[in-house]
């Protein structure tokens, strides 16, 4: 019995890299295709998010986003049915657009973006229009 090989196989079954093949925005879940498993498609997987109780973030990866998934160990008997999408990651195929570690930026396919430089400047660009709603807005 090759214990090292068995452990590596179990780890590869728990942590898997795949590509998002469909998105369910209502349930905040995705299906993921695993090319290394003959394009096997997962059940709908929940996405790990920032905040999920009173302060909530909403972000679902787009179709074709490369993601890292974590599945419950096979010994539980559930395989690719019970797991989570931990998130997307940069790669040669999908490199970051920013390289400054102080910058926080969200860019959208239409050209809109929100960028904070970490030094006090926030740049917001909306491709069509920008809506601000508040009882009072101060611009100086």
Residue ranges and their predicted role:
Residues 1-133:
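Hydrophobic packing positions characteristic
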């Amino acid at each position: 019995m090759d214990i090292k090989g068995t452990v590596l196989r179990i780890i590869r079954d728990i942590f898997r890299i795949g590509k998002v093949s469909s998105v369910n925005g209502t349930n905040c879940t995705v299906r993921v295709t695993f090319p290394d498993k003959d394009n096997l498609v997962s059940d709908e997987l929940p996405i790990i998010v920032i905040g999920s109780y009173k302060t909530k973030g909403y972000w679902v990866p787009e179709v074709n986003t490369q993601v890292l998934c974590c599945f419950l160990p096979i010994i539980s008997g559930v395989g690719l049915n019970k797991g989570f999408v931990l998130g997307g990651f940069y790669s040669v195929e999908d490199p970051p657009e920013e390289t400054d570690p102080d910058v926080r930026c969200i860019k959208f396919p239409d050209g809109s973006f929100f960028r904070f430089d970490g030094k006090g400047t926030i740049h917001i660009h909306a491709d069509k229009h920008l809506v601000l709603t508040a009882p009072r807005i101060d611009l100086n």
